[in-house]
Amino acid sequence: MLSGAQLRVWRKQERIERVRRETTAALAHELKTPLSVLSATAELLGDNLAPEKQAHYLGVIQQQAQRMDGSVRHMLELSRLETGAKALRRTAFSLAELAQERLQAALPADSTIRTEFAAQDKFEVNADRALLARALDALLENAVQHTPEGGCITVHLADGVLSVTNTGDAIPADALPRLWEAYYQADPSRSAKGDGLGLSIAKTVFDLHGFTCGAENTEIGPKFWFRFADK
């Protein structure tokens, strides 16, 4: 009969092993395509190509290398969060100010996407600022990826809830509950940008803080939200 302490240790070890297996399988899956592209492109560079063609294929190699680097970093980050290897470092700060800061940094200078920000208060929270910034970045990156040019992304804080809403197509109802799962994509064609880890990382950060989160469709487009305080 295991004691309470032994059972907790066993469960933690089981969780770490599960995450290790899932991360290994995910790495093999996610790196297969970019590695194939790198191999094929490297073979083409071995041919006698014009300088402009060489520059093009070198750009492809750089792009795929960056994709692999991002996927590996995101998977390792998610693994550390899920296994508890990364502890929370709580400090007091204004969530409204952090959200406005991340919104301003979310778009490239030449983007035609508009942004709107509204907050009832500064909303002081005691949380891990760096991790919440990462979670907010994930919500905003997702919004940017699915907002058409000329569209709008709105960040709103009220009644203990922060929401990110973007103009664009509605999310299929059967996909809404699964959006926070690692590697899940509502578009089975995988034409969407990203590696499918951002929202999962965000949810893990929210879970660590004891926050709830969700996604829904609105009249103007999808909305992702998390509750950080009672009303």
Language-model segments: residues:
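Conserved micro-motifs of the catalytic ATP-binding
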Residues: T83-L88, E124-A127
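Conserved glycine-rich
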Residues: G210-F211, A215
